Structures are given as structure tokens and as C-alpha cells.
């Protein structure tokens, strides 16, 4: 029996800014954003849209009535939680109409949370092959206007349905995990924006990949030649490339070109969205599968997950025969192409708005599953 990703999709808010416009507004060379960090556009959301909004829209795109009857676990990986006690997964469970006899909860460990959820889902299905698990990575990455992290913001969600005999990616049992207590990125309770040690975070990311890769190679004997593509956590698209370049310098030029060509296919969507935190690796996986022209059934895909603080994991998936028939490339391209571009003034005004849940209010938004009202601090969603 194989277990893995049976369905996968993503959702981003209907607004974005162009990175050239942001660079000009911040008196920065546009090349620093387009080339230096590798970003072209950045997703932006109004206060009427939160992680539940994104999670519900992403999940709705992949779930059938039969899926909702088979799902007995709903997991949301996030570091943008809307409540200190109640899990967004509980609200998502109701909005999706999933059968009631299910577990629903959140997982937090920076950008790693959804990977923890995916592995937990895999283990659950191994024990209950007739059941399915909905795993959603949903986040809003915000660092503040005019901050160093401003060009690496973003928002959205990735939804994955984990099942036995998956139709897209079968997960292997070769995981290598790494935990280190490092303050490279953190957000103390009550702080609206994270604290970031940029140089340390970059260094820890690169070092973490090197450690789990070397340990994985030691345990399995697998090297780059055994992988048809690698997908990385992508806080910005140059980050994964830095870690990759540090490890492939001893490979032949042809091998380096092969590996980097697949990497470029994995970052196409992220260049247009920005940082999805927990969803970044899986947005990269979707981009790889929907844009790579050389992948085929049986190919081995290596996945590197990283969450600051810091937890990292490397694991492998094998592409299933006919996987291309279960992707949603046209839908995803339409989602990205039909967004509204905001001027920098509009973006700054939207960014400056805050949702005061202590004030009863109604909110106007045409997007399905957006917040319709706040009553006694409780959020109501359109559906």
C-alpha cells in the first residue's frame, strides 16, 4: 500500500502589488527584488480575509462529497492563527461540511507546521487505509511597511488530501528530521510582526539543508543523481537556490544544470505570490508538477521543509502514473492572472487597516468564505 498526496491545490487573495513599483516607492533598485531575492509580485489581502478564508477556498477546490465522508482528520499548519485557543481547523471542518466524527487541530512550528501535519496524516492513513486526511497550510506573512522583510511578504493557502493509493505523489519512509534551538525568526505573544535575524536565518536554512541532506545520503546512499527534482521551502525564491548551490558545487556542470532547471520550474508561482510560510514548500511542489516538462511517473522528488527556530526535514515522494490528470494548472493560472494589481498607495492603505475583533461590525467582501461580521469577538464567514 502506498500513502501520499491524492489531491493538491492552492489559493491566494485577489490582490497583488508589482515588485518594481514597490522598489521604486522604497527608492531601491528593482533588480534587488527581481534578481536579488527573486520576486516579481506579492500577494496582498484585506482585513476581511484571513487564514480560514484562504484555507476554505483552497480546500473546496479539491474536495468531493465522498472525500468529506472519508475524512476523519483536519489539520491546519499555520503561524498566523486567529485564536489563541480554538483551532482554525475546527472552523474549516464546518465550512467544508466534513462528517462530524473527525479530529481537527492546528500545528505550529514556524514554516514547518504543514510538513508535520503531512507526516502525521501519512501515519494516520497507514493505520486507517480507508480514511483520508485534509492538511492545509495557511498563512499571512507580514513584516511591516518599509521594513527589511517587506518584499518577502505574501498570503494564501495550500490544501492537500492525504490518502492510500494516492494519485499524485506517494510518500516514502526515508524522512530525516533536524531540530535546533535557534532564534533566527520568532514572534513573541502579542507582537504583530515577527522578530528576524536575517543573516542568521539564511545561514541556518543553508546549514539545515546541508545537515539533513548529508544524513539522508548517509542513511540511504541516495545522491542528487537519484532525484529527478528537488522542491524547497521558499521564503523568497533565491533562498532555496542558495542552499542548493552550496551542495551541488561538486556535481558535474550538466548535473548542476539539470537540477537548477527543475528548481526554476518550482519557483514560477512563488515569484508571483511571495512567502506563504507553511505553504511555501507545497506551492513550490505544485509549481514544479504543473510546469516541469520532463517529469514522468516513477520520478523521485526530494522535498526540503524548514521552519525557523529551527526544525527541518528532508523526505522523498514518487510521482504516480497519471498524476498530470489530477493537477489544476489552468485553474491556478486563472487565479493568478485575474487578480487586481494595487498601487503602492492602495497597498499601504490596505496594509494599515486592522481588524478590531473587540468591536461588533460587518465587513463587505465578495470573496467566498471572507469574514462577513464580527460579533462578540467571533468571526462569521460567507459561504
Curated annotation (Swiss-Prot):
Provide the reaction this enzyme catalyses.
acetoacetyl-CoA + acetyl-CoA + H2O = (3S)-3-hydroxy-3-methylglutaryl-CoA + CoA + H(+)
CDD domains cross-referenced by the UniProt entry: init_cond_enzymes (cd00827)
State the organism of origin.
Enterococcus faecalis
Q: How does activity depend on temperature?
A: Optimum temperature is 37 degrees Celsius.
Name assigned to this protein: Hydroxymethylglutaryl-CoA synthase
Q: How is its activity regulated?
A: Is sensitive to feedback substrate inhibition by acetoacetyl-CoA. Is inactivated by hymeglusin, which also blocks the growth of E.faecalis, indicating the critical role that the mevalonate pathway plays in isoprenoid biosynthesis.
Q: Which GO terms describe its biological process?
A: acetyl-CoA metabolic process; isoprenoid biosynthetic process
Role noted for this protein = Catalyzes the condensation of acetyl-CoA with acetoacetyl-CoA to form 3-hydroxy-3-methylglutaryl-CoA (HMG-CoA). Functions in the mevalonate (MVA) pathway leading to isopentenyl diphosphate (IPP), a key precursor for the biosynthesis of isoprenoid compounds.
| Pathway recorded for this protein | Metabolic intermediate biosynthesis; (R)-mevalonate biosynthesis; (R)-mevalonate from acetyl-CoA: step 2/3
In the record, what terms sit under GO molecular function?
hydroxymethylglutaryl-CoA synthase activity
Q: Which family does it belong to?
A: Belongs to the thiolase-like superfamily. HMG-CoA synthase family.
Q: What gene does the UniProt entry assign to this protein? A: mvaS
pH-activity profile: Optimum pH is about 9.8.
Q: Which Gene3D superfamilies does the annotation name?
A: 3.40.47.10
Q: Please state what class of enzyme this protein is.
A: transferase
